[in-house]
Amino acid sequence: MILWKSLSCFSFVFGLLLYSASFVCAGDIVHHDDSLPQRPGCNNNFVLVKVPTRVNGSEYTEYVGVGARFGPTLESKEKHATLIKLAIADPPDCCSTPKNKLTGEVILVHRGKCSFTTKTKVAEAAGASAILIINNSTDLFKMVCEKGENVLDITIPVVMLPVDAGRSLENIVKSNAIVTLQLYSPKRPAVDVAEVFLWLMAVGTILCASYWSAWTVREEAIEQDKLLKDGSDELLQLSTTSSRGVVEVTVISAILFVVVASCFLIMLYKLMSFWFIEVLVVLFCIGGVEGLQTCLVSLLSCFRWFRRFGESYVKVPFLGAVSYLTLAICPFCIAFAVFWAVKRQYSYAWIGQDILGISLIITVLQIVRVPNLKVGFVLLSCAFMYDIFWVFVSKWWFRESVMIVVARGDRSGEDGIPMLLKIPRMFDPWGGYSIIGFGDIILPGLLVTFALRYDWLANKRLKSGYFLGTMSAYGLGLLITYIALNLMDGHGQPALLYIVPFILGTLFVLGHKRGDLKTLWTTGEPDRPCPHVRLQPQSS
């Protein structure tokens, strides 16, 4: 069907262009920024700070701020943080000695024109136990020391709040209410169960897609052998039909992928906004509907109750021949995608996003094929360099990681682009999500599905084939990605940096050891005996 093929190609390009690195999407709570000045007394890491408040003794709101490069470190547990009364500075910027007397209160000040260290020293000299600085915008600014300043004598914590949080507290205090608060910076757990589930989700997606792809190819091969044995004229028609919905990656397209994907990523980076995210949501819904419909139709067709509807077709204007089963399932898929798009800001929306995403990935891995190891090597090598460049190297040109900024949607006011699988971090005091980009599943998955197709066509057992090795290599590479993620305090990691060497290395080593490397590299299919040979009588 023409529409199905065009949507399949769209799904492939869409899935590849919009993939991102694997990283925790809660906002890094620890920033090791070596580009900003450090010296004794001014070498703290930038950490996010929780500020739970009480108004007249009742729990109110919890705000989030950021700590300064200087001053003492904060407690990591709420039970150890002291509940302290909040006071407003007079003058508001605290650049000169406050008129009001302080006896251990936390002082709320405006950013003003003097340095952060100056106002901190003034507040400390006036008797403040901590200082909250209201920023001029909703962003959190990194508070550093000025050149030549002596900060060794600063002994009170310094925290910056966004302007909306600061003004809210200021208005409450001005209304003569008694505001008390705590300051603490909880640490993230070394491992969150969300990462385990995300690992299982990624591995399971490739596993399902691989067996579906291999089963389809084997059925085509069996049917082809049967027609060839019978000498049927339907052989040519079968070859044309079987390849109609398949997109084969070539060396040229693998190389062009890096160029096109890089241009698209820069466009996303420059044009990122609320409305641009809305466009991406619409595109994701289109791909998700196609993927979910394809998966459901194929799954239900395995049951005899639905098989008859899946094999009966009706002509639909502009669409061509469509099965009755597809017509019945399509409205449900559209309704599901629309429901997710409308409710995507809710806490449970990640479930719908993952269902649509997994369906899209499985469909792409079913219709897109790597013909041989040579193409797979070029594709993964290009993606390997692409991932590293846009996660790490781009920081030197753009002063921030382009890949991570795009994936998190930092400039859009949204939670990030929808082309991600994500699971909420269940035991993380900061919340957020563990996420993985589509490309970190699709690109390695293309080579894993290729390995299983080769094994089935060559009648190899699981232990003697290549699928078990490549599948294990992917799982191990992804596991090391999460280890690196935790070692780097949640900073974004290019998953392909760890996955690609494992997968390619496994295929090359096993192929060389078993003598199949030349076949894997060139044809990508094992030599199979012609059915006619078995039918020829032996000459006496």
From Swiss-Prot:
It comes from the Eukaryota. Residues 1-26 form the signal peptide. Glycans are attached at residues 56, 135-136. InterPro entries: PA_dom_sf, PA_domain, Peptidase_A22B_SPP, Preselin/SPP. A motif (PAL) lies at residues 494-496. GO terms for cellular component: endosome membrane. This is Signal peptide peptidase-like 4. It comes from Arabidopsis thaliana.
